Amino acid sequence: VGVTTLTSLNDRDLKLIGYNRSVKNLVAHQSKLARQAKLDALVCSPFEVNIVRKIFKKEIITPGVQIGKRNYDQKRSMEAKKVNSDWLVIGRSVTRGNIKKNIQKLIKSL
């Protein structure tokens, strides 16, 4: 399993750490590398799933998925019902507060 770019990073953050690419450009590049390396799965932000799907034809895992609009520390997160991924990683949206109610809310949102 490979990782494209952390959901807590945006274009500005990439520049600060020395990348001269946009998030989308870096994700596309890393998707090509993952395909060449014959990885079984690739992790990417909800906003880059469509970019990755065009290049990488295997499983896509998507963190930064939220129930509702709260983003916590994620800069590139999205509501679960809008994500076209094979696997969704949903953390604090479920674990903070009443877990049973949050899971029911998640199921209803899908």
Q: What are these regions, as identified by a protein language model?
A:
Residues I55-F56, N84:
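Short, structured coil segments at secondary-structure junctions
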Residues A34, V52, G91, L106:
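Conserved, mostly hydrophobic/aromatic
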Residues R21-A28, P46, S77, R96-K100, ...:
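Electropositive phosphate-/nucleotide-binding environments in soluble metabolic enzymes
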Residues V1-A41, S45-V49, K57-I61, I67-Y72:
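Conserved anion-binding
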Residues V65-I103:
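Glycine-rich phosphate-binding active-site loops on the catalytic face of alpha/beta enzymes
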Residues E48-I51, E79:
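Short acidic active-site motifs
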Residues L33, K101-L110:
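Catalytic-site microenvironment of enzymes
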Residues D11, V52, G97-I99:
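Short secondary-structure boundary/hinge segments and terminal tails
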